[in-house]
Amino acid sequence: MTEAGKLPLPLPPRLDWFVHTQMGQLAQDGVPEWFHGAISREDAENLLESQPLGSFLIRVSHSHVGYTLSYKAQSSCCHFMVKLLDDGTFMIPGEKVAHTSLDALVTFHQQKPIEPRRELLTQPCRQKDPANVDYEDLFLYSNAVAEEAACPVSAPEEASPKPVLCHQSKERKPSAEMNRITTKEATSSCPPKSPLGETRQKLWRSLKMLPERGQRVRQQLKSHLATVNLSSLLDVRRSTVISGPGTGKGSQDHSGDPTSGDRGYTDPCVATSLKSPSQPQAPKDRKVPTRKAERSVSCIEVTPGDRSWHQMVVRALSSQESKPEHQGLAEPENDQLPEEYQQPPPFAPGYC
């Protein structure tokens, strides 16, 4: 008898029909004595050789869907096909009677002879070794197929020993714990992400504030540059007035004039009049001169170098006074000075 834990070799595909359709029906009331599994024709003849006449056995056929009835005749062993019909009945080809089971077929031919030899079935041929039956492989294979159909996933796992599975599970635990620790550390180190809608709102607000911030920065830069330019230009002009050649000339030409000191210090007055050219203002402590006197003073004291300096001051002041709300208006030409600050023609009165 084969070992209980060892599976038999797989049956040929032509025997699958027996395992799936006939095994339960055949073993319902116990396996009959005349059934010998899927033995070959030669093995069947060897078993019947020592048996009396009329001894028979039934085996699973290897050539068709059905069985083979083998019995011992007077001269030799005879073999008849037993076909399994579509409705589940059994019939020997050439006969007209179909039987519901193999037991019914055996009982029928124990009473009526098999054509054409007209011989009856007398007694079944039993197993040669009852401890090692020849149909055991079929039943083992049928049980294995039934278990695999019931639980196809757990069948391979049961074949491996349990200690190995326990050892593998113990080895896998540290790696799983390490993975959990690393995932926790990664989640703790990463800052919480803000929702997408909140991020969009922040971005939109910053984009809205860009033009206003740019305008404020531009105004601050303009005011800073204007103050720096004015302060530097005023310092340069004061140094040139104190130590320049224009001062000596004015003092020599007007040394006898009591107002020569005032005229030598008329540049700050001119600078203040540039801030509001339309309304020139004179110092309070001196008399207001006539138009001709102003022209003569401007002609005497204003030189080409002074004119360029005045132009730079006017440009700086105009850029400082320009504001965003006046951007649409046309700017006045910075190069055009009032008539009082321009050089008079060569033959104008008061020209010297």
UniProtKB/Swiss-Prot annotation:
List GO molecular-function terms, semicolon-separated: protein-macromolecule adaptor activity
Q: Where is the composition biased (Pro residues)?
A: 343-352
**Cellular localization per UniProt:** Cytoplasm; Nucleus
State where composition is biased (Basic and acidic residues).
283-295
Enumerate the SMART domains for this protein.
SH2
State the superkingdom: Eukaryota
Q: Which UniProt keywords apply?
A: Cytoplasm, Nucleus, Phosphoprotein, SH2 domain
Q: Name one Pfam family in it.
A: SH2
Q: Where is the composition biased (Polar residues)?
A: 180-191
Q: Which GO terms describe its biological process?
A: negative regulation of B cell apoptotic process; negative regulation of mitochondrial depolarization; signal transduction; T cell activation
**Coiled coil (UniProt feature):** none
Region called Disordered, residue ranges: 157-199, 241-352
The record, for CDD domains, names: SH2_HSH2_like (cd09946)
A cellular-component GO term for this protein: cytoplasm
Relate the assembly described in the record.
Interacts with FES and TNK2.
Report the function annotation for this chain: May be a modulator of the apoptotic response through its ability to affect mitochondrial stability. Adapter protein involved in tyrosine kinase and CD28 signaling. Seems to affect CD28-mediated activation of the RE/AP element of the interleukin-2 promoter.
Tell me the protein's name: Hematopoietic SH2 domain-containing protein
Native organism is: Homo sapiens (Human)
